[in-house]
């Protein structure tokens, strides 16, 4: 063991910092809230035990949740088991407790005080303390994590985290915000200081496959690289008896198998090797989810309407490309794509056209914006005026020797039919679209490196419209940021900064609507589809509450986060397997739940 000498001056400084961090005094006029009366959304009939097996399309490139290659879909499984201070009730959007048991608001409008649950524990048994939240700030500001968005947010948006003893903290943001937004924008997740100890230049590589201590109900227990990842429920989880956690997180194990093809995955489901299967895709719902397994009641179907912000799904145009940097080309391309035809044919009328990047955010969404309609006459006129009059023998336009030929990268094989239709109609306007199907991992890396021309994908949603990460020039022309169109517009930058700084709700709404219009006008994003429901099928041994989901449920089969309300009935599982062998039949089940269905289209 090595010992390092510390001179007296440094020792005095360290002691001073330590004493100062514990010497902060809470304001005397704080009014503490807890929302302990929030209504649970689980069922008292739920039982513990069993396993839930699902699939993922690709093995994650890392277990890190920040830094290079961390923004994959698998990150959501890890984040869902890392609790924050508070959360939003999935039905009412009220603030509800997580690691914090109580909270209070400072008079400055930008500070929230939190009392931490003294019983909160990391998965390795260590207590969660105020120091873990202070360490989060140091961690997220470190250049060694190689995460520009987090560096910026935790440096410029969160100005301080103060400690008032081991179990009380305050967080102060850059500007005042409405109370519910303070929790969303300035809320912190603790980082295990005892585990990391220090962050250095080797951090990204060192922690690529480390299983980090967490605070949620499950922890990764087994990894078979390239094959599967298993999460196991903690038998002594510190928050298990919280009222909002009772009767939730019921299965003992969650197994995620890597199956790189959705059709093959569906065959695994029919064999009983997967417990559920999402059937949002019309091809699966109409063509595959039928037959004896459904007629005999072994597999049960459902459609569940939700009411929440819609994924920003569509085509993202990279303005760093020599062709797509021309705004007229981008507008013409939007007019050359017949999304309505795709909806009526391939999608069987099951989907709706998404109208704008931010949809479903109430008054924060600009409802006056409509996606550009299919109009070949308009597309041809725009391209002619933009200098693309000449056409080659194949009908593709040419300007200064360059063909109007663009590559579309996408990561789902089952989307090929819809893009083929768009490709055919675009050619009528003289635009060649080359379809480039990639596996999920390659698709993600291509986009994050900004190596695409056109990318098809959908972003997850948030509490309020997010502009800075997607459209501010600070995130353009560099890899590993979410501005995948490389939009670089100083006027838009100015309004984004004003939106982030504004404290008045009405003014923020106006700014959000104005920004939505500017983004539409820039034509860097072509909206595709929205789906106002989730639907799927599961083996009859999966049981649910009377309300099988919440207002904001994007799937009924989420074992983590605000999900975890289903359970496995072991007796029914044994009965069902026996029934299949002797051809015993049950009543077929195909239910629709529409209590949260929107009354009007957004």
Q: What are these model-derived regions, one by one?
A:
Residues 53, 129-136, 168-172, 178, ...:
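Alpha-helical secondary-structure segments
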Residues 115, 150-198, 217-224:
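Surface-exposed binding/hinge segments that line
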Residues 101-146, 170-172, 258, 265-268, ...:
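Aromatic- and charge-enriched surface segment that lines or borders ligand/interaction sites
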Residues 82, 89-94, 186-248, 253, ...:
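Gly/Pro-rich hinge or "lid" segments in bacterial periplasmic/extracellular proteins
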Residues 35-37, 56, 77, 224-229, ...:
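Detector for C-terminal structural segments
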Residues 143, 147, 221-232, 257-321, ...:
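Extracellular/periplasmic solute-recognition and catalytic clefts
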């Amino acid at each position: 063991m090595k010992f390092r000498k510390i001179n007296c001056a440094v020792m005095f400084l360290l002691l001073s910092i330590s004493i100062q961090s514990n010497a902060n005094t809470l304001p005397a006029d704080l009014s503490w809230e807890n929302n302990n009366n929030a209504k649970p959304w689980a069922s008292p009939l739920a039982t513990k035990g069993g396993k839930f097996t699902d699939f993922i399309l690709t093995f994650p490139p890392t277990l890190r949740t920040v830094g290079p290659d961390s923004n994959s879909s698998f990150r959501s499984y890890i984040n869902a088991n890392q609790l924050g201070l508070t959360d939003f009730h999935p039905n009412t959007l009220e603030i509800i407790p997580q690691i914090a048991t109580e909270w209070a608001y400072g008079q400055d409008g930008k500070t929230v005080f939190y009392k931490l649950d003294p019983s909160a524990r990391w998965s390795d048994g260590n207590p969660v303390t105020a120091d873990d939240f202070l360490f989060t700030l140091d961690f997220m500001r470190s250049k060694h994590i190689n995460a520009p968005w987090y560096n910026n947010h935790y440096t410029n948006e969160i100005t301080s985290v103060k400690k008032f003893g081991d179990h009380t903290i305050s967080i102060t943001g850059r500007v005042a915000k409405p109370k519910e937004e303070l929790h969303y924008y300035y809320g912190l997740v603790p980082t295990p200081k005892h585990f990391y100890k220090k962050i250095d230049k080797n951090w990204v590589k060192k922690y690529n496959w480390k299983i980090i201590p967490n605070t949620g109900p499950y922890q990764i227990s087994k990894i078979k690289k390239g094959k599967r990842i298993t999460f196991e429920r903690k038998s002594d989880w510190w928050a298990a008896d919280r009222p909002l956690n009772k009767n939730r997180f019921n299965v003992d194990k969650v197994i995620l198998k890597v199956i790189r093809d959705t059709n093959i995955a569906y065959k695994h489901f029919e064999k009983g090797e997967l417990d559920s299967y999402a059937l949002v895709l019309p091809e699966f719902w109409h063509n595959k989810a039928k037959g004896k397994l459904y007629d005999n009641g072994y597999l049960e179907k459902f459609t569940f309407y939700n009411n929440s912000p819609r994924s920003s799904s569509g085509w993202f145009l990279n303005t760093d490309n020599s062709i797509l940097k021309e705004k007229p080309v981008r507008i013409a391309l939007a007019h050359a794509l017949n999304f309505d035809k795709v909806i009526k044919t391939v999608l069987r009328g099951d989907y709706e056209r998404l109208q704008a990047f931010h949809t479903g955010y109430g008054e924060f969404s600009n409802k006056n914006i409509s996606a550009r309609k299919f109009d070949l006459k308009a597309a041809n006129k725009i391209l002619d005026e933009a200098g693309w009059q000449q056409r080659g023998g194949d009908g593709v336009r040419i300007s200064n020797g360059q063909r109007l030929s663009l590559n579309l990268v996408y990561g789902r094989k089952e989307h090929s039919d819809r893009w083929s239709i768009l490709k055919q109609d675009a050619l009528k306007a003289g635009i060649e679209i080359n379809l480039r199907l990639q596996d999920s991992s390659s698709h993600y890396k291509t986009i994050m490196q900004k190596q695409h021309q056109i990318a098809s994908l959908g972003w997850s949603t948030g509490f309020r419209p997010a502009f800075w990460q997607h459209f501010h020039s600070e995130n353009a022309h560099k890899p590993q940021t979410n501005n995948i169109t490389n939009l670089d517009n100083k006027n838009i930058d100015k309004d984004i900064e004003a939106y982030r700084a504004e404290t008045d709700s009405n003014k923020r709404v106006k700014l959000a609507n104005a920004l939505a219009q500017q983004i539409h006008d820039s034509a860097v994003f072509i909206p595709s589809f929205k789906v106002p429901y989730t639907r799927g099928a599961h083996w009859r041994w999966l049981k649910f509450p009377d309300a099988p989901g919440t207002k904001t449920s994007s799937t009924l089969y989420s074992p983590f986060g605000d999900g975890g309300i289903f359970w496995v009935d072991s007796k029914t599982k044994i009965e069902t397997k026996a029934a299949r062998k002797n051809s015993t039949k049950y009543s077929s089940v195909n239910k629709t739940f529409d209590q949260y269905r929107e009354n009007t289209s957004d």
